């Protein structure tokens, strides 16, 4: 009856890690490491069929948080947790350089690739780097609208049918936010101007444009439908 517990927990892990990294809040680090210990003790006994069944549900980028916690502490239990959330059905096709995105939920994919980017930075796993690069270019070249946003009703669609998806439900802000995060990783590795160009385009046309500066309003979608807001 619970929608996505690890998706919610990811926000707690990520926020506490940021508290420690950006404000040197030692209490935040203590809390998040205890949460990591709890997660390890809870998940370590699970068998493989149970693991695969569990990660079919959306879990956000909790594996990225575990990689970050591993980077901070050096505790290999947190690396194990990050690898535990490796989603074979999603990541394996990208390793094979296949665009298997279909009509799947867009923002379920991007955080999982973010975790692979972090894995490469910590372990020099070249498979993780290659699939990150492939995914980024596939997204930008085939699944992104002109302003830098992606998705219709939160899902991928056939890029050959783009004209049928100029709706009032395009451009989920979460997707662009995570694509900017992924772009930062890629640009640090390559210095590729194409990555920086996308970052600038998506930041100004979508992320900043989604906010109303005077009254504090914001929008969830960036509609591509003419005259729709």
Describe every region a protein language model picked out:
Residues 1-229:
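Glycan-recognition and catalytic cores of secretory/periplasmic carbohydrate-active enzymes
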